[in-house]
Amino acid sequence: MKTRQRKRLFVSAALAVSLTMTVPMPASVNAAASDVTFTINTQSERAAISPNIYGTNQDLSGTENWSSRRLGGNRLTGYNWENNASSAGRDWLHYSDDFLCGNGGVPDTDCDKPGAVVTAFHDKSLENGAYSIVTLQMAGYVSRDKNGPVDESETAPSPRWDKVEFAKNAPFSLQPHLNDGQVYMDEEVNFLVNRYGNASTSTGIKAYSLDNEPALWSETHPRIHPEQLQAAELVAKSIDLSKAVKNVDPHAEIFGPALYGFGAYLSLQDAPGWPSLQGNYSWFIDYYLDQMKNAHTQNGKRLLDVLDVHWYPEAQGGGQRIVFGGAGNIDTQKARVQAPRSLWDPAYQEDSWIGTWFSSYLPLIPKLQSSIQTYYPGTKLAITESSYGGDNHISGGIATADALGIFGKYGVYAANYWQTEDNTDYTSAAYKLYRNYDGNKSGFGSIKVDAATSDTENSSVYASVTDEENSELHLIVLNKNFDDPINATFQLSGDKTYTSGRVWGFDQTGSDITEQAAITNINNNQFTYTLPPLSAYHIVLKADSTEPVNSDLVVQYKDGDRNNATDNQIKPHFNIQNKGTSPVDLSSLTLRYYFTKDSSAAMNGWIDWAKLGGSNIQISFGNHNGADSDTYAELGFSSGAGSIAEGGQSGEIQLRMSKADWSNFNEANDYSFDGAKTAYIDWDRVTLYQDGQLVWGIEP
């Protein structure tokens, strides 16, 4: 994909005719909303959710907490890792320049250093704990220089290009020869492995993509690959490049063939010679998978780990496609919120030439998975470019949130958003709903469980738990109706009784994620909640009580305010004991004290004294919905706090808190308060966490 809208060429007669057909509009979604029932079973359909589905090709606001990042797009087809030159191709006057340096935050002084674009990209992935997918070059040539437009007379081979060789077949160099006219892919991988370690290490690059959208090379990069790509050529290149990568880093995952869309899935964009190869294959994807499996057998190792496709829906409404045109009219917006159903729902038919002429290939994810199961079992599935348009409209936010839930529910391994509009506030909100709903990088659970809705047209629901204990249940619920609220009934089943819930979300009034009314009416694992029109909510349900794991850490407490429960300050004092046989790093611990503010004022906090040094303790405040508490104070410890020796203790920590307006508290109803405790005593109403896991106390 490029930064401007690409052309889609479909040269087969059937496709050409299909673009002129009048297609019936989908059924209206504006009927009055009825009551909806959501059923969730934490014991059914359990499976891990791949963390890589919350990925991107652009970083947007930087608050989305991306799980995977891809260095890809049309620019990467002509990228020269030796000097960081690249070609814009037809996207922008066939320019060869240093665009990728500026776009990737590489300083001008570093732009001539080998691999600078890739290392800057991966350094940022490491900084954010994200999985990296790096595109390698396979079309045949890359930019030799950064000297601007390349004339048609300078089409490769010419002095404006270096030839791509997959294997060097000679000793590697970390300072590649810049004037030999060759660029070696295995030498690039060796350069990266030398810098970061191989893919099995914590810092290594995990995945490489076999170029980008090869079916469009003759359209997007005619100076590099002017002839239309043939199916056998793509397979041969894929095998040879994958072998070269795996010979250097056998742990790396190979993504391919990065097909741009349905025309490529079907026939590699009517590739020359495809009819003679098709045989009994239902589409090109079957042929590609089968050939890569044969190569696996012949070479004794897997050469394709992840089937990689791109998906920009062709669905339309009101005469306008849902992507590449902003929010669109009201019918476009309605089509957009329904469009993710083409990923999974056999009962749905979208308004598009695909839905009209090739409906047997939809829904898409089951079709792709069927091809994998038939022709190359064990291959994973990725959608490394996608967008549902309307990035700054509620319809785009809801469609994106729906797609993310679908990716998790139906076993997609990796998925990466591609930015098609300047303002992406609602798309950003959709990702944050899963990955940073509270501003503290809290996210959807890692294990999906069974969730269903009684009304797939007007609503969606996705469910997950955070661990095998099912103590925290996460729900994403969407109201896709444009006019009416949904009166939702939630019916939960499983091995836990849930007693309270907090809710975050966004809606058509704004893209900011805000905390909504808490859930306090759960009775026998059933409750009701009203979802406004066009809204997306993340519900976090807590089980009856969260018990700490078996631990040698103990929190002692006393009231430092001598049972003065109605003044304008709270003064809890703490001591942390380590009864184990190994020291405990204090920086791995956080402590929480729960109370009621008795107002909406902001909170302030101070450490009056601490044996380990008040400057080594950080105070923060969070909202909480539980018994006798609406707020908690959290203490964190810096590395300067040191550790608690085996059999030792932290020493006294004196916390003092007040409201910004200095109004009085009523501590008598506070969960963690006990004015009778004037000397230190073990107190399980103050909680302690080690590396985020509860190790002492009982949460309210």
UniProtKB/Swiss-Prot annotation:
Residues 550-700 form the CBM3 domain. The keyword Transmembrane helix does not apply. The active site is at residue 213. Pfam families: CBM_3 (PF00942), Glyco_hydro_44 (PF12891). GO terms for molecular function: cellulase activity; cellulose binding. A short form (EG-A-S) arises from post-translational proteolysis of approximately 150 AA at the C-terminus of EG-A-L. It comes from the Bacteria. Residues 1-33 form the signal peptide. Keywords: Carbohydrate metabolism, Cellulose degradation, Glycosidase, Hydrolase, Polysaccharide degradation, Signal. Its EC number is 3.2.1.4. It catalyses: Endohydrolysis of (1->4)-beta-D-glucosidic linkages in cellulose, lichenin and cereal beta-D-glucans. GO terms for biological process: cellulose catabolic process. Belongs to the glycosyl hydrolase 44 (cellulase J) family. This is Endoglucanase A. It comes from Paenibacillus lautus (Bacillus lautus). The lineage of its organism: Bacteria, Bacillati, Bacillota, Bacilli, Bacillales.
